[in-house]
UniProtKB/Swiss-Prot annotation:
The lineage of its organism: Eukaryota, Fungi, Dikarya, Ascomycota, Pezizomycotina. It comes from Coccidioides posadasii (strain RMSCC 757 / Silveira). Keywords: Cell wall biogenesis/degradation, Disulfide bond, Glycoprotein, Metal-binding, Secreted, Signal, Vacuole, Zinc. GO terms for cellular component: extracellular region; vacuole. One of its GO terms (biological process) is proteolysis. One of its GO terms (molecular function) is zinc ion binding. Belongs to the peptidase M14 family. This is Inactive metallocarboxypeptidase ECM14. Substrate binds at residues 265-268, 323, 340-341, 398-399. Residues 561-582 are annotated as: Disordered. InterPro entries: Peptidase_M14.
């Protein structure tokens, strides 16, 4: 067992076995569940076959899933981090990140105009603050362009960006897995301290072989799909997790699918790790958890960790804070487009978005980004030719801890399913809060983040980062996905895009719990006969009571304001919202 750990650890570092990923597959996942006798169809558990036991033993040994019974541990390091080397200092100079407090739409507009003039990098914005990266010697120029109300309304949140960037890269590990650790019989009860893969951020050269290995070991319900190739020729790879139940109706029925994406913006590493965490939890939970087994039978889950593989590789090899993809533009020295501004619905190439040097350059036209175009083509092909109906979409970004629903391009056009979108978003926020007491705000993507109570008191400020051409709007409007969200993950600005690795597992747990709520909501009445409580990765003291009587049928009236009022009550039920059969 110890030898296997050493070999696997070396593999994760050197990745000597990288080979071409199997060519694109559009076939459905297995049409029945007969290949996997471990599937649970009752509260009891069938004894696993020899291969299942062997496979799970290997998986437990290599990548141990964090325990859902303990609070997320913060992995200590006995190594002191040295000063950033000259190469990083040369790239980031004396850059800092400032947070401006905004109080009116005039403040928002002033910051937008000043940032456009100086070509500044807006990191994040909410209804209350805006984070901007700039060089120290540009601060005075920025303040000179702002009204007096903003000249003193700012504080530095990152004083030394170069050092922060250096510290965000993986450092030498201070310990190795304990070979004498007593392995638990369940993958889902393992210790997070043994979870090699999720102890740190991983480069693409490690992620792809890891995905290939999981797909080969769990072939009964997992496949790799190649959605297309990036501008630089890398394959855009995703997991497809799903299997039709043995008692399913005709295989010609349309298969419902849910898409979870990350890495559209290259520097948002936490989104990539979180998609992988959720995928791993679904893969290893099938056949062990009734809830996960039900979700995998009812839906195909397509999880794409890196929508922007070229940009992601570039953040590891050259510029940690690169945002766009890597395709060439009219200006050779300003490559790349913002992929989340290039989707076809309400594409907007005006103002700074028409400047190739802008961080949110929208390209020369709708689907001007190579990666967004091939993913859209894949989705349309699945819908038109492979009998798939997409019913859910979660696009993971960072940072600012927000749950955003359509539309991004406009605050005046209201989505027709607004009440349902808000209702599910609030349930997701509650699941996240119960995980580790982190508060995620809920709002329309066109607005800044606004708490539920503030939203009811008056109109929210328009977000500095709202725009047309977003994946969120395209999936919701053009692909008719009824439940589409963008989740902006941790944190609220202490680290921004440079979130320390100790947050990987806690953030993964938060989104995994959110996905369970998401799937449960979409199951409708089919969720009633399952005990969901045991599958949430909550600390023991945060586990909610879920009495059956709290279920609200689809015909029952539900006042969203009641849910908003109850959202601050730590003891209220998680499932106290109306589920929807899709």
């Amino acid at each position: 067992m110890h030898i296997l750990q050493v070999i696997t650890g070396a593999t994760l570092v050197s990745v000597p076995f990288v080979s071409a990923i199997p060519s694109s597959t559009s076939e459905f996942l297995p049409s029945t569940a007969e290949q996997n006798s471990a599937v649970l169809h009752s509260q009891g558990r069938s004894p696993p076959r020899l291969w299942t036991r062997l496979r799970d033993s290997i998986i437990e040994t290599i990548w141990r899933v964090p325990s859902r019974q303990h609070n997320p541990s913060r992995i200590p390091s006995s190594l002191s981090i040295p000063r950033a080397p000259s190469s990083i200092r040369a790239r980031y100079g004396d850059d800092v990140v400032l947070r401006f407090t905004i109080r009116s739409q005039n403040d928002v507009q002033a910051l937008i105009e000043a940032s456009n003039i100086l070509f500044l990098d807006i990191w994040a914005s909410t209804n209350e603050w805006v984070d901007i990266r700039l060089a120290k010697d540009v601060v005075s120029s920025l303040l000179g362009l702002l009204p007096s109300s903003l000249r003193t309304a700012h504080v530095p949140i990152i004083h030394d960006l170069a050092q922060a960037v250096y510290e965000s890269y993986p450092q030498p590990v201070s310990s190795v897995p304990n070979p004498h650790h007593a392995f638990s019989p369940s993958v889902q009860q393992s210790s997070e301290t043994q979870n090699i893969f999720f102890q740190d951020y991983q480069p693409l050269s490690v992620i792809i072989p890891w995905m290939r290995l999981l797909a080969s070991m769990f072939s009964t319900h997992v496949r790799l799909v190649n959605l297309g190739t990036s501008y630089e020729g890398r394959e855009i790879v995703g997991f497809r997790i799903g299997v039709r139940p043995a008692n399913a109706d005709l295989p010609t029925e349309r298969r419902k699918a849910i898409v979870i994406t990350g890495g559209s913006h290259a520097r948002e590493w936490i989104g990539v790790s979180t998609v992988n965490y959720v995928a791993y939890s679904l893969i290893t939970g099938y056949g062990k958890s009734r809830a996960i087994t039900k979700l995998v039978e009812e839906f195909d889950w397509v999880l794409i960790p890196t929508m922007n593989p070229d940009g992601y590789v570039y953040t590891w090899e050259t510029d940690r804070l690169w945002r766009k993809n890597r395709q060439e533009n009219n200006l050779q020295f300003c490559p790349g487009v913002d992929l989340d501004r290039t989707w076809g619905y309400e594409w907007d190439g005006s103002d700074s978005r028409s400047n190739p040097c802008s961080e949110d350059f929208a390209g020369d036209g709708p689907f001007g980004g190579r990666e967004s175009k091939v993913i859209a083509q894949w989705a349309l092909n699945e819908t038109n030719h492979h009998n798939v109906t997409f019913v859910g979409f979660l696009d993971l970004h960072s940072y600012s801890q927000q749950i955003l629903y359509p539309y991004s391009y406009s605050c005046t056009n209201i989505p027709p399913t607004l009440e349902n979108l808000e209702e599910l978003a609030i349930g997701i926020a509650k699941a996240i809060r119960l995980t580790d007491h982190e508060h995620y705000d809920v709002s329309s993507a066109c607005e800044g983040s606004v708490s539920s109570h503030k939203k009811r008191r008056g109109a929210a400020l328009r977000s500095m980062q709202s725009a047309g051409g977003s994946a969120l709007d395209w999936f919701y409007h053009d692909l008719h996905v009824r439940y589409a969200y963008q989740l902006k993950l941790r944190d609220k600005g202490g680290y921004g895009f440079l979130l320390p690795k100790k947050n990987i597992v806690p953030t993964g747990k938060e989104v995994y719990n959110a996905v369970l709520v998401f799937g449960q909501f979409l199951l409708g009445r089919g969720a009633q006969d399952i005990d969901w409580e045991g599958d949430f990765q909550f600390p023991a003291h945060s586990r909610p009571n879920v009495p059956e009587k709290e279920y609200r049928g689809p015909d029952e009236e539900y006042e969203i304001s009641n849910q908003l009022e109850d959202d601050d009550n730590e003891n209220d039920t998680l499932l106290g919202f109306r589920t929807q059969k899709v």
